[in-house]
């Protein structure tokens, strides 16, 4: 399905490029935006699935418990890079924060503090971009928990 949506988007962009004065320009533009929204939603659902799988490793005997969280982070970040003005930016951003938080909590001791710091960075990025977010209470709870793991002494 994604290949079909991407092909349709390319065809509509081609139409806009070769027929910029067409009477159907506005229709083509709105169709492009609609297709982009569908692609973003599909990728969001993929990212959310990875997040929901969390530390589940299935039948894999080699699997790291954090692969699903990492996949959720990478998928959501790629969507934000490709479609920076998406309507789902807040949902993708909170998903990244949640996944980084859970990945950090489940990390081995050697990596935990660094990953907690990455989570704090993501917290500040989220808070700056969405100061009035409906997720702000959850974000503050994550920050409070993460702060416990980060050493503050500069020795």
Regions found by a protein language model. Name each.
Residues 1-155:
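Acidic, polar-rich low-complexity tracts and alpha-helical solenoid repeat scaffolds
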